[in-house]
Curated annotation (Swiss-Prot):
Disulfide bond positions: none
UniProtKB keywords: Methylation, Ribonucleoprotein, Ribosomal protein, RNA-binding, rRNA-binding, tRNA-binding
Protein name: Small ribosomal subunit protein uS12
Family from the record: Belongs to the universal ribosomal protein uS12 family.
One Pfam short name: Ribosom_S12_S23
Keyword Ribosomal protein in annotation: yes
Gene coding for it: rpsL
Region (Disordered): 1-28, 104-124
3-methylthioaspartic acid PTM positions: D89
Matches recorded under SUPFAM superfamilies: Nucleic acid-binding proteins
Alphabetical list of InterPro entries matching this protein: NA-bd_OB-fold, Ribosomal_uS12, Ribosomal_uS12_bac
Length: 124
């Protein structure tokens, strides 16, 4: 706790909030190009092969992004749209690829939560 004379000399420092997705540069989404598409294993106690991509963004950053949903069509040089949002069991993955935009296809045969996976309405 500062004294009155300390506060007269210099005011209190404002706390600055640190962003959880710095590569987006305060934008809701960013475009990027996949440099590598691969699978990664999660932290304990989980076990899986999570699909991730290394993406070079228009902001100049190169980040690791998660590919949500079952099956994908991404490969090297695919143009993707990224949003914030980490994957809790993959260290260093702080972004999600948005399905159904640019080169990323929506999830096939998806019937529930379709808007989150870029899937069109079923034909029946």
């Amino acid at each position: 706790m500062p004294t009155i004379s300390q506060l007269v000399g210099s005011e209190r420092k404002r706390l600055t909030k640190k962003t959880k997705s710095p590569a987006l540069k305060s934008c809701p989404e960013r475009r990027g190009v996949c440099t590598r598409v691969y699978t990664s294993t999660p932290k304990k106690p989980n076990s899986a092969l999570r699909k991730v991509a290394r993406v070079r963004l228009t902001s100049g950053f190169e980040v690791t992004a998660y590919i949500p949903g079952i099956g994908h069509n991404l490969q090297e040089h695919s143009v993707v749209l990224l949003r914030g949002g980490r994957v809790k069991d993959l260290p260093g993955v702080r972004y999600h690829i948005i399905r159904g935009t640019l080169d990323t296809a929506g999830v096939k045969d998806r019937r529930q939560s379709r808007s989150k996976y870029g899937a069109k309405a079923p034909k029946d």
